[in-house]
């Protein structure tokens, strides 16, 4: 049997008039919609029941047939078929036009397809279509030229001169249709190919464009005449509804207005033609019909848009598809779903990591069908109907059944904005009183949630498969690591950190110091009986099983540390157990801060896996909350002690500033130097004040404890509270040289307060803009990477890339070890000292092996990379390496493209927006933060361009009064000279040796220049390290592989330069594998291969250049993408994720991949019996 959703590809094309008539159930002849008295549709109107089907289920228009039993009968009185009203969503009608009109997409798009095909300019075409000029269709014997334009006067003169029937000229779409019908596509393509060989410059570009359109029509089987419309399809009435409002008025979709205008003008034109009206009147009516159809298809594309009440432009068919509110993004890519709810969240410190609290009434509504089924199964209710009644009346026995139903049925919690995949996680629900969802405190970081009124949505996975996926892949206890860098995301925060810090502190001279206890329990008992203090240094005998023998030893520790270590595995590697002295020590024998907790979790995950780690995390959470309550840390004004040394430091700074001012006034230093020295001095003074403050604070000072543990606040905030606020930035981003001397404890004066608010407002405005920009960047990244999925185990390539540490100046931004962990080698790695092979080729490098490689002194390693992967679509598991979220090798079917896009986009909001101004020097305003990342991914020419050397060689600098020039002398004697513009800073000095592609002046490099000089590999390396620099400077870690995936997608296309004997067109962009395939075909027959160069496309261009027209159309420029796809008759192979979501199939990733499709799931009750239960409408 043919299944509707079982297809492999989807094709788009132009519709012929015959096809449109075939779709239609009848012709719409009248502009009427609904009779205002009877509220029934008018016959032959836009809502006609005869054409589109009945308004009410199983009921004809006149009421002769009512009820299901007449199903399928066509009423003999009113001609309406008795069927479901739902058919009004699918049945189409049509309008027969009295005169053909052109389709605005093909005439007006850029480039104009109609214009290219006929070799006419769009302006000339417009004159003909809108009845301003005649066009010669057949000159016959006259000296007129074919396709020559004649205005009214010239036409009259020609008719007078040559006679009435001596030539044929026409106007409007009819004339164009006739000319389009005469075009011979095959001959035209041949002729254009001949011309292409001789032409150059602009002419060549135009020929290539024309050839592309001609070949598209020839190959796709579209007839050029179909760009002119004779029949207009009318979409089903329920997709353009008309609803009655309270006051008896009607609200209608804009499309009805647009259709009405078309029908009115069409009918008027028919009348005029029947009456044989004068030519000029008919022509005017035809022009108006053309404009009405234009407005229906794409309102506002040409001339002023048709407006409705209140001067609002009407939404045309094109607008229905476009933009965020269009069909693609609103209804196809994201739908509202049943079995979901939302509520405010509150903290649930008593929950386990895999649990969430679900309000009772919400749970009952969400699990209603399950509860009803269970009630019937248990015999509490006799049938579904009575079960439904029980649930609706909320009888007491319903709650017991609900408890049973939700055990082992995970739910998904989601918080908007979902910036990465941890924004949706699965939890085991626990019923709670009240109306708020309870969330585990450790899940907050992943969701970026807090409890100041945030809301979250709950979704119920229905099928057994969905439940299994939620339980195994999405349970919060398993998502401990961040997919972007593989570090733990569930690190305890705030109170939990403070409690752990308090617990592991020690205080000299505390009560009971130096006492000795026979075991842990005795020590804890002494603490609980208030004999000793929790922070006192004591001696305890601890017992350990070593090689099956119980041994003991005395260690020096505190009760707090003993309690803390009870919940921590004692083999995490923080203590060297081989050492006799350390054999019995506690694993965590240091002061625990947020940072060290991260390391503890990391180690635990690597050694014990997620399950044990999540148990440990729950224990740390419980301890943290308990002991931060016992510690009772508070904050008071008296805790902020201003260091007495501050005033001396300020006085000393003032004196230095005076000296600098004097030097400047005497002309020893320039304005820039003075400014920089003043800023430097104040920065240093502020630091000194802050250091003095930190030294003077007691270790048990609550503010110090909070900052030091990482629970809340930081050194810089304490500096502002009790030290001095220091330098502030002005809204332009320039640092003001007037520092704020006071701290908040002392209080700011009016000027200081004003200066500090000045810069702060800029920060707030930036944050608001940043969110939108960052979201848009994520959307483009997702679009360009969405079809990158791990498709196979090993692509078998021998290629790879060399990696070494990334440096910015002398500072190491990313270490080599970090770049090696979780990657496969592309060649044997040999120890340079001993000559032994450390790692063989194609081997996996875990942290231990990576350590070995780095400690052998190797600086450069060749690894497998997504860049060099030979997979036709997606990447292979070996080129990708480790899955950052699980710290294991990646599985086939993982959607690594989406993960990469999310990993880069999610921290986007943390990046800065501003351009830093370093003084007033030209050319040194380098873009940083989010704009810089965008500039790189869009492969734009950057602001503040650096001059780049094109050859290897030695530098010679020449300075004259007028200009500076740099000469690079190559090895083969060739010399390149570069003029240095005023104000640029040189990066090289006289006599330096530089490589091709190195910067001569400071600034950013245009990635396209690097592509030309160093090739694709150089450009890829440059983009990767530049993006890494931006993120690392903001303290964000992103693994290289995510950037590799994106940059790979940017360099996938080849620009064809010469076509050789292939079918490729010069100047077109084509996928690199298609290019190689076309050449391989030609090679078999010994023909001439095509030549091309790899291109670097920005992410927007790369996303639009995808093979899938559905994916591209749902991204941006919808009409342009669909116009092109229709003319080419494109076939969408449905390879990526978006296109499959759009047509409603399972996505080809994860368990949706073909290789996993056949799996059968067994639930606990071995056999699933599908008892047919009656469904109550």
From Swiss-Prot:
The keyword Metal-binding applies. Disulfide bonds: none annotated. One of its GO terms (molecular function) is DNA-directed RNA polymerase activity. Zn(2+) 1 binds at residues 60, 62, 75, 78. Keywords: DNA-directed RNA polymerase, Magnesium, Metal-binding, Nucleotidyltransferase, Transcription, Transferase, Zinc. It catalyses: RNA(n) + a ribonucleoside 5'-triphosphate = RNA(n+1) + diphosphate. It is an enzyme of class 2 (transferase). Mg(2+) binds at residues 450, 452, 454. Its cofactor is Mg(2+); Zn(2+). Binds 1 Mg(2+) ion per subunit. Binds 2 Zn(2+) ions per subunit. SMART domains: RPOLA_N. The keyword Zinc applies. Its EC number is 2.7.7.6. Pfam families: RNA_pol_Rpb1_1 (PF04997), RNA_pol_Rpb1_2 (PF00623), RNA_pol_Rpb1_3 (PF04983), RNA_pol_Rpb1_4 (PF05000), RNA_pol_Rpb1_5 (PF04998). GO terms for biological process: DNA-templated transcription. One of its GO terms (cellular component) is DNA-directed RNA polymerase complex. InterPro entries: DNA-dir_RpoC_beta_prime, DNA-dir_RpoC_beta_prime_bact, RNA_pol_asu, RNA_pol_N, RNA_pol_Rpb1_1, RNA_pol_Rpb1_3, RNA_pol_Rpb1_3_sf, RNA_pol_Rpb1_4. Belongs to the RNA polymerase beta' chain family. NCBIfam families: rpoC_TIGR (TIGR02386). PANTHER family: DNA-DIRECTED RNA POLYMERASE, DNA-DIRECTED RNA POLYMERASE SUBUNIT BETA. DNA-dependent RNA polymerase catalyzes the transcription of DNA into RNA using the four ribonucleoside triphosphates as substrates. The RNAP catalytic core consists of 2 alpha, 1 beta, 1 beta' and 1 omega subunit. When a sigma factor is associated with the core the holoenzyme is formed, which can initiate transcription. This is DNA-directed RNA polymerase subunit beta'. It comes from Clostridium botulinum (strain Alaska E43 / Type E3).
């Amino acid at each position: 049997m043919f299944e509707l959703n079982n297809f492999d590809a989807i094709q788009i094309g132009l519709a012929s008039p015959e096809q449109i008539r075939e779709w239609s159930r009848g012709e719409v002849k009248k502009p009427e919609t609904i009779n205002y008295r009877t509220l029934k549709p008018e016959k032959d109107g836009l809502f006609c029941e005869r054409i589109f089907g009945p308004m009410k289920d199983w009921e004809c228009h006149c009421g002769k047939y009512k009820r299901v039993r007449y199903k399928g009968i066509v009423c003999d009185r009113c001609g309406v078929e008795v069927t479901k009203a739902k058919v009004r969503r699918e049945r189409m009608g049509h309008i027969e036009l009295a005169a053909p009109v052109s389709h605005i997409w093909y005439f007006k798009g850029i480039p104009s397809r109609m214009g290219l095909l006929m070799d006419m300019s769009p302006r000339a075409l417009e004159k003909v279509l809108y009845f301003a000029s005649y066009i010669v269709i057949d000159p016959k014997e006259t000296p007129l030229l074919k396709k020559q334009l004649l205005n009214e006067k010239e036409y009259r003169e020609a008719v007078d001169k040559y006679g009435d029937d001596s030539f044929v000229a026409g106007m409007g779409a009819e004339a164009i249709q006739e000319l389009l019908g005469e075009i011979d596509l095959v001959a035209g393509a041949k002729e254009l190919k001949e011309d292409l060989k001789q032409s150059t410059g602009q002419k060549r570009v135009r020929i290539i464009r024309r050839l592309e359109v001609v070949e598209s029509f020839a190959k796709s089987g579209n007839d050029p005449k179909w760009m002119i419309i004779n029949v207009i399809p009318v979409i089903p009435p329920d997709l353009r509804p008309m609803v009655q409002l309270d006051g008896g008025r009607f609200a209608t979709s804009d499309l009805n207005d647009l259709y009405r205008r078309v029908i009115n003008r069409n009918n008027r034109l028919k009348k005029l033609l029947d009456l044989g009206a004068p030519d000029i009147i008919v022509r005017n009516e035809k022009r108006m019909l053309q404009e009405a159809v234009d407005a229906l298809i794409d309102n506002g594309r040409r001339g002023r848009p048709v407006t409705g009440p209140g001067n609002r432009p009407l939404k045309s068919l094109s607008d229905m598809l476009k933009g965020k509110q269009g069909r693609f993004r609103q209804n196809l890519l994201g739908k509202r779903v049943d079995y979901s709810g939302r509520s405010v969240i509150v903290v649930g410190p008593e929950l386990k990591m895999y649990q969430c609290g679900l309000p009772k009434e919400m749970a009952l509504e969400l699990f209603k069908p399950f509860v009803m089924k269970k009630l019937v199964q248990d015999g509490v209710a006799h049938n579904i109907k009575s079960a439904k009644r029980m649930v609706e009346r909320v009888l007491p026995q319903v709650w017991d059944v609900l408890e049973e139903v939700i055990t082992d049925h995970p739910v998904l919690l989601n918080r908007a904005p979902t910036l990465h995949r941890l924004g949706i996680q699965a939890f085991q629900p626990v019923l709670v009183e009240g109306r708020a969802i309870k969330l585990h405190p450790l899940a907050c970081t992943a969701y970026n949630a807090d409890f100041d009124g945030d809301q979250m949505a709950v979704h119920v996975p229905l099928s057994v498969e969905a439940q299994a996926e939620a339980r195994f892949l999405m349970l919060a206890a398993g998502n401990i690591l961040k997919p972007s860098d593989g570090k733990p995301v569930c690190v305890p925060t705030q109170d939990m950190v403070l409690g752990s810090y308090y617990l592991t502190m020690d205080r000299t001279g505390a009560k009971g110091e130096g006492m000795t206890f026979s075991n842990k329990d005795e020590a804890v008992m002494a603490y609980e009986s208030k004999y000793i203090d929790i922070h006192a240094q004591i001696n305890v005998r601890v017992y350990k099983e070593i090689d099956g023998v119980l041994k003991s030893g005395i260690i020096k520790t505190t009760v707090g540390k003993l309690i803390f270590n009870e919940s921590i595995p004692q083999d995490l590697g923080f203590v060297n157990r081989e050492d006799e002295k350390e054999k019995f020590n506690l694993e965590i024998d240091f002061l625990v801060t947020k940072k060290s907790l991260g390391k503890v979790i990391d180690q635990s995950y690597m050694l014990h896996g997620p399950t044990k780690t999540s148990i440990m995390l729950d224990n740390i959470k419980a301890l943290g909350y308990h002991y931060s309550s016992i510690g009772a840390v508070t904050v008071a004004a008296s805790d902020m002690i201003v260091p007495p040394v501050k005033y001396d430091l300020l006085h000393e700074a003032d004196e230095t500033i005076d000296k600098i001012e004097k030097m400047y006034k005497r002309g020893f230093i320039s304005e820039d130097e003075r400014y920089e020295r003043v800023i430097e001095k104040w920065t240093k003074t502020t630091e000194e004040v802050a250091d003095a403050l930190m030294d003077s604070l007691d270790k048990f000072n609550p503010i110090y404890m909070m900052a030091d543990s990482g629970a809340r606040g930081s050194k810089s905030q304490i500096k502002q509270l009790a030290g001095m606020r220091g330098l502030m930035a002005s809204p332009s981003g320039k640092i003001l040289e007037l520092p704020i001397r006071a701290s908040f404890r002392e209080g700011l004066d009016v000027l200081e307060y004003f200066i500090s608010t000045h810069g702060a407002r800029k920060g707030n405005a930036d944050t608001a803009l940043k969110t939108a920009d960052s979201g848009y960047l994520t959307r483009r990244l997702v679009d360009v990477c969405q079809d990158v999925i791990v498709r196979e185990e090993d692509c078998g390539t021998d290629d790879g890339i060399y990696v070494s540490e990334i440096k910015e100046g002398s500072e190491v931004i990313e270490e080599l070890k970090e770049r090696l962990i979780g990657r496969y080698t592309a060649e044997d790695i040999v120890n340079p000292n001993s000559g032994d092979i450390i790692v063989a080729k194609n081997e996996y490098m875990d942290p231990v092996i990576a350590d070995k490689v780095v400690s052998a002194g190797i600086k450069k390693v060749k690894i497998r990379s997504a860049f060099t992967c030979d997979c036709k679509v997606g990447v292979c598991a070996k080129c990708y390496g480790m899955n950052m979220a699980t710290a294991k090798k990646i599985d086939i079917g993982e959607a690594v493209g989406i993960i990469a896009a999310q990993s880069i986009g999610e921290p986007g909001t943390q990046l800065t927006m501003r351009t830093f101004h370093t003084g007033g020097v030209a050319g040194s305003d380098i873009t940083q933060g989010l704009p810089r990342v965008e500039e790189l991914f869009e492969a734009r020419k950057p602001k503040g361009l650096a001059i780049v050397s094109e050859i290897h060689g030695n530098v010679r600098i020449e300075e004259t009064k007028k200009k500076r020039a740099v000469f690079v002398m190559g090895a083969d004697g060739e010399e390149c000279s570069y003029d240095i513009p005023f104000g640029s800073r040189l990066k090289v000095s006289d006599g330096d040796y530089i490589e091709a592609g190195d910067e001569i002046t400071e600034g950013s490099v245009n990635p396209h220049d690097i592509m030309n000089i160093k090739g694709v590999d150089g450009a890829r390396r440059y983009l990767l390290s530049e993006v890494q620099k931006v993120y690392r400077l903001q303290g964000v870690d992103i693994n290289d592989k995510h950037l590799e995936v994106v940059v790979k997608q940017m360099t996938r296309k080849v620009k064809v330069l010469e076509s050789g004997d292939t079918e490729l067109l010069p100047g077109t962009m084509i996928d690199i594998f298609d290019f190689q395939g076309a050449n391989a075909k030609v090679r078999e027959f010994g023909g001439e291969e095509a030549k091309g160069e790899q291109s670097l496309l920005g992410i927007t261009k790369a996303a639009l250049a995808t093979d899938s027209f559905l994916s591209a159309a749902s991204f941006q420029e919808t009409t342009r993408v669909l116009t092109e796809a229709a003319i080419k008759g494109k076939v969408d192979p449905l390879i990526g994720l978006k296109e499959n979501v759009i047509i409603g199939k399972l996505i080809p990733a994860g368990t949706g991949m073909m290789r996993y499709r056949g799996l059968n799931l067994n639930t606990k009750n071995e056999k699933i019996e599908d008892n047919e239960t009656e469904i109550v409408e």
